[in-house]
């Protein structure tokens, strides 16, 4: 064997027990651990107090982490040719740490540790910190803009979890509206906020409008949107739009039909003051009553959600911008894939920003169906 690729997790697992059971391991571990202490200068440099310095014991979990780091460091110090020698004694590596004789630079150690296994930037940095402290080396920082493969993998997992939560939240709210709020009557004052919140939520989900834009629509406006797929209006004001006549688009039909059904039974419920925080309070109450728990829920997450799904299903960015009533595609870009998932299948997509990673459509799901007008 030529030694290429020998520094891997399988080889590490073979060496791990041998490193930890080596006669010198505990002694070197105690030395390396003690070198992790950061003694304040006012104690260390004081002739009086330095004599009475009390070394605070490390927590068991900290010692366990340190031991794991030292094992990986010793393994990474071994040259590849020696890794293939079952009789190798590791004295060279233990001497390096004990007597602070540098064999491998921090950067080279990073390289070798990345060959060993996929780790996060934080984990690698902590291990390098342990190494530089143990060897009395200058601080070594992994560059700020670096994102390791494991970080990307975990980021994708977190995005999937977040997207599952958002999808489930929207479906839960729609089911709550369809089963409970649809039957409510605005004659009861306590129910009005929920009815308002439900209508505005469905309009936002069906058109991509902002919360204060959505509450301006009438039942007649919804009829036109559902029938024709778009609505041109000179009475509905849109944020950051200079044009007097604005075009609204039907992006999702089912939520608009649900909004119309509730709105037709309560035609005056959205007649509230123009400058009021009521719509936002209604939105939060709707989520609470539906049993949806979200950290810092924001109404504009629906616009982000719709933009991403349109873009990922193949709709050009310029058209997505037009559907969102943005003046420029540059305004739409920050929306993309913030709350993204593949609506066409039960499996979440793995590429957060990969244009080619999700090309499915969502026509099979009533609550997620969308249509676009030209």
From Swiss-Prot:
Coiled-coil annotated spans: none
GO biological process: DNA integration; DNA recombination
Catalytic residues identified in the record: 210, 239, 303, 326, 335 (o-(3'-phospho-dna)-tyrosine intermediate)
Compositionally biased region (Low complexity): 357-367
Tagged with keyword Transcription regulation: yes
Keyword vocabulary terms for this entry: DNA recombination, Transcription, Transcription regulation
Region feature (Disordered): 328-374
One Gene Ontology MF term: DNA binding
Domain Tyr recombinase intervals: 169-349
Role of this protein: Involved in very late gene activation.
Protein name: Very late expression factor 1
